[in-house]
């Protein structure tokens, strides 16, 4: 009865350990982040080796139990009195049952190992694919980082050019303001020159009118002077003729 309890406890421990292995394998096969994908193959192999060691220890302990039972049964057979030989069949039956239980436990263990191997064989391609995708994403990330650096350099260059353009614009604004100021002064001077020109034109017109009046006055004086000269010439001629006649009349 004690042996059956030991076998039941061993089988229960084996089932619990197998469930733990399956749970750990399922936890390992769950989706992980990008930073953990590269560690999945090593992690899975590590878990598999650790679980394999656990199963080996469990199998060793079970073999020790079986060895102990076989040794105990052999000692019991050798130490039995002739009166106890009647229960030999019952002991053999117990041993047979124990061996059958051991075979069942071993078969269950091997089934669980096969399940784990199958799960690992299915998970490894997924891990490789995840690792490949991680590598591609890493390359894409590096390319994006390179493009980001190029864009940042272009942005800095554009900012510098914008600052230079702003300075040039400020200089052009100052130059434009100076040109407008000078143009305004030139226009003011031009307006003053126009006004002076109009004044000079008016003065020239007035002077021309004075000159015309003076010319008319001079022409009038000249004509009057000519008339006086002619009149004086005629008078002198008359005087000369009169004197000549007087002289003739006085001569004998």
From Swiss-Prot:
Q: What keywords were assigned to this record?
A: Cell cycle, Cell division, Centromere, Chromosome, Coiled coil, Kinetochore, Mitosis, Nucleus, Phosphoprotein
Q: Which GO terms describe its cellular component?
A: dendrite; kinetochore; Knl1/Spc105 complex; nucleus
Q: Which residues form a coiled coil?
A: 120-221
Q: Name one Pfam family in it.
A: Zwint
Q: Which residues carry this modification: Phosphoserine?
A: 216, 249
Regions of biased composition (Basic and acidic residues) lie at: 89-99
The answer to whether keyword Heme applies is no
Could you state one GO biological process linked to this protein? homologous chromosome orientation in meiotic metaphase I
Region of interest: Disordered:
80-99
**What subcellular compartments does it reside in?**
Nucleus; Chromosome, Centromere, Kinetochore
Q: Does the keyword Cell division apply?
A: yes
Q: Self-association or partners: how does it assemble?
A: Component of the KNL1 complex composed of KNL1 and ZWINT. Part of the ten-subunit outer kinetochore KMN network that includes the KNL1, MIS12 and NDC80 complexes; a bioriented kinetochore contains approximately 150 copies of the network. Interacts with the MIS12 complex subunits MIS12 DSN1, and PMF1. Interacts with the NDC80 complex subunit NDC80 during mitosis. Interacts with ZW10. Interacts with CETN3.
Please explain the role this protein plays, according to its UniProt record: Acts as a component of the outer kinetochore KNL1 complex that serves as a docking point for spindle assembly checkpoint components and mediates microtubule-kinetochore interactions. Kinetochores, consisting of a centromere-associated inner segment and a microtubule-contacting outer segment, play a crucial role in chromosome segregation by mediating the physical connection between centromeric DNA and spindle microtubules.
> By what name is this protein known?
Outer kinetochore KNL1 complex subunit ZWINT
């Amino acid at each position: 009865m004690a042996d059956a309890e030991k076998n039941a406890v061993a089988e229960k421990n084996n089932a619990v350990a197998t469930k733990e292995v399956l749970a750990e394998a399922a936890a390992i096969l769950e989706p992980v982040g990008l930073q953990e994908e590269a560690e999945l193959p090593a992690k899975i192999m590590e878990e598999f080796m650790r679980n394999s060691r656990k199963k080996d220890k469990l199998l060793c302990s079970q073999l020790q139990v079986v060895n102990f039972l076989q040794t105990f049964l052999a000692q019991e057979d050798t130490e039995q009195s002739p009166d106890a030989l009647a229960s030999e069949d019952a002991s053999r039956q117990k041993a047979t049952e124990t061996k059958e239980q051991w075979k069942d436990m071993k078969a269950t263990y091997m089934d669980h190992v096969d399940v784990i191997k199958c799960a690992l064989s299915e998970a490894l391609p997924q891990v490789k694919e995840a690792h490949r995708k991680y590598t591609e994403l890493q390359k894409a990330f590096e390319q994006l980082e390179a493009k980001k650096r190029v864009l940042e350099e272009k942005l800095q260059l554009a900012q510098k050019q914008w600052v230079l353009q702003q300075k040039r614009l400020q200089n052009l604004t100052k130059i434009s303001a100076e040109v407008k100021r000078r143009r305004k002064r030139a226009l003011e001077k031009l307006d003053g020159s126009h006004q002076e020109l109009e004044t000079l034109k008016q003065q020239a017109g007035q002077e021309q009118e004075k000159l015309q009046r003076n010319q008319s006055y001079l022409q009038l004086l000249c004509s009057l002077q000519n008339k006086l000269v002619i009149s004086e010439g005629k008078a002198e001629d008359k005087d000369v003729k009169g004197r000549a006649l007087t002289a003739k009349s006085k001569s004998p």
